[in-house]
UniProtKB/Swiss-Prot annotation:
PROSITE patterns the record matches: COMPLEX1_30K
Catalytic activity field: a quinone + NADH + 5 H(+)(in) = a quinol + NAD(+) + 4 H(+)(out)
Cell compartment(s), UniProt: Cell inner membrane
Lineage: Bacteria, Pseudomonadati, Chlorobiota, Chlorobiia, Chlorobiales
Gene designation per UniProt: nuoC
Biased composition (Low complexity): 11-20
Gene source species: Chloroherpeton thalassium (strain ATCC 35110 / GB-78)
Protein name in the entry: NADH-quinone oxidoreductase subunit C
């Protein structure tokens, strides 16, 4: 009995259907390859957004810029938010030493207008029963590029009131000094050292005011806008 005369094994319906689908897919691939050889390449399907952009570009019309979200109007009769109540307590105590509250939705803050009062304000923020800002979450140095340096402090009252508030303190680049709050919030210790290392801000009263990332004899402060990398450090070329 020849190979052709041998009975072929009977396939299960599921396997037969699977093999038929594979054969159909293979035939479709061969047809696609043949059409490509003939110069017909399949076109990529564009997303609706990309198709609209291409149509606008073709017609010479620029896509309109999306409207910026408008700030919600402030309801003067509403109950104050927790951070607003906290600010009012601070403002009542220190008056003109602090600015008005910038009540933006992302990071409401006030500015310390009298830098000499900053330690007293900080201590009050931590100790007053109505405030209890027991956690300094972050401290960030900033070079504003107009002769001013500054520090942005983010505070939380984790144990009690659950409110948050941000404080900004400025100093001049010629005399960059701000009172330290490292003995009020322990987390400020290394944060202040980093701000000193990167911006040259001296935190007066800090227990260990020295660089924390760069070598002690490094030239300049790397995050200032006018910083220029030194070319050689102890005979070693500085890569940049």
């Amino acid at each position: 009995m020849s190979e052709e005369e041998k009975p072929k094994p009977k396939l299960s319906p599921a396997l037969a259907a699977k093999m038929a689908a594979m054969k159909k897919k293979q035939e479709g691939g061969e047809e696609a390859a043949a059409s490509q050889e003939g110069g017909e390449k399949p076109k990529a399907k564009l997303s609706p957004m990309m198709a609209a952009r291409m149509a606008a570009k073709k017609s010479g019309d620029a896509s309109p810029a999306p409207d910026k979200p408008k700030a919600e109007p402030v309801d003067e009769n509403r109950d104050p938010e927790p951070h607003e109540m906290a600010y009012r307590v601070i403002k009542e105590k220190f008056g003109d030493a602090v600015s008005d509250l910038d009540n933006n939705p992302l990071m409401p803050f006030f500015t310390v207008e009298n830098v000499d009062a900053w330690q007293a304000i900080a201590f009050f923020m931590r100790e007053d029963e109505r405030l209890r800002f027991d956690y300094m979450a972050c401290l960030s140095g900033v070079d504003y590029g107009d002769g001013r340096l500054g520090v942005v402090y983010n505070f939380d009252a984790l144990a009690t009131h659950k409110h948050k508030l941000t404080v900004k303190v400025f100093c001049s680049k010629e005399d960059p000094r701000i009172p330290s709050v490292a003995e009020i919030w322990l987390t400020a210790d290394w944060h202040e050292r980093e701000a000193y290392d990167m911006y040259g801000i001296v935190f007066e009263g800090h227990p260990d005011m020295r660089r924390i990332l760069c070598p002690d004899d490094w030239d300049g402060y790397p995050l200032r806008k006018d910083y220029k990398v030194q070319e050689v450090y102890h005979g070693i070329k500085v890569p940049y």
